[in-house]
Amino acid sequence: MPRKFNFGAGPATMPESVLLEVQEELLDWKGLGLSVMEISHRSPEFIEIAKQAESDFRDLLSISEDFAVLFTHGGATMQNAMVPLNLAKSDGLASYVNSGHWAKRSIKEAERYTNVRIAASSEDDNFTYFPEQSSWSLDEESSYVHYTPNETIGGLCLRTLDSSPLPIVADYSSGILSEPIDIEKFSLIYGGAQKNIGPSGLGFVIVKKELLGSPQPITPNLLNYTLIHEGESMSNTPPTFAWYVAGKVFKWLKSIGGVKAIAEINYRKAKKLYDFIDNSDFYSNQINPKNRSIMNVPFLLLNENLNNVFLEESSEAGLLALKGHRSVGGMRASIYNGLPEEGVDALLNFMEAFENKYSNV
């Protein structure tokens, strides 16, 4: 059966060449007579996988030795607790930018462990724009300022960043490796792997080493960045298979030219979709053009009564998971690194045919 195109927000499409390589190695990894899922995380073989994955990740993002790279359990949701537990005081203060659903989730969790100040918010306009950095009101007493560069549900992003008087913390779950970023502007970047890195269940943290060492006393050992760093991300048994696949994805990305190369593809994919939507009277996108995400493209049908028909017929055409989040409705095409450009082309062909078929309904 030919593979279909997955436009879901995550777990996302994996590069097919990576899946085939994993399939080939699944029963016998490097002649051991065992699957990589069966070998000890303490074995020399897995230590090699882990070290190579970190090395390739560092190469792709030009991460200096001033930063620790951690691979963790729990994805980004657990990081919503880990960040304040490790960087803020229980009676201290942290600043957060409220840009949408995931920013609000981060804020709600952080409020359990420190005092939160909202530095900026676009909730007054239903999150149709991203608060520009120049509008952020930062309290100098804050331990850090946190923002979510790409909001998957709303389909908006902030793609440029200047330096800040406060340490900058960013949830890069859905934007990591999609385009070049200047790591040196950040103090901590975290995210879940299931968009652009690999299977779900794995998280990543890139944190300045100078910030390690002062967690809140209540911080569980498994959520303590310092202990995770000292234990080389193996304080307990890590999600070994997801880590192994992540290493394969890093190798794949390097083989096609790295982050700059995939960014050109991503810009092209997104431009095709937005150009088509903007030139249509049948579809629309509500996000301020300068804040549009290159990873998640939400769109509405002029006739909402056709939503279910669109989903049924697109699924029959091999275009899966296009339903928008329940909080915003409509449709959403998530076009992460692993989704080939021909997937976007197939979606555009379907959207055009659907419009021609139902424009008079």
Where are these regions (language model features)?
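PLP-dependent enzyme catalytic core of the Aspartate aminotransferase-like
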Residues: 1-4, 316, 329-361
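N-terminal "arm"/small-domain region of PLP-dependent enzymes with the aminotransferase-like
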Residues: 1-40
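Conserved N-terminal alpha-helix of the aminotransferase class I/II PLP-enzyme fold
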Residues: 31-79, 86, 101, 109
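Conserved PLP-anchoring active-site segment centered on the Schiff-base-forming lysine
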Residues: 88-104
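Conserved active-site segment immediately N-terminal to the catalytic lysine
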Residues: 169, 183-194, 203
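Active-site C-terminal subdomain of aminotransferase-like
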Residues: 193-274, 288, 358-361
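Conserved PLP-binding catalytic core of the aspartate aminotransferase-like
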Residues: 283-314
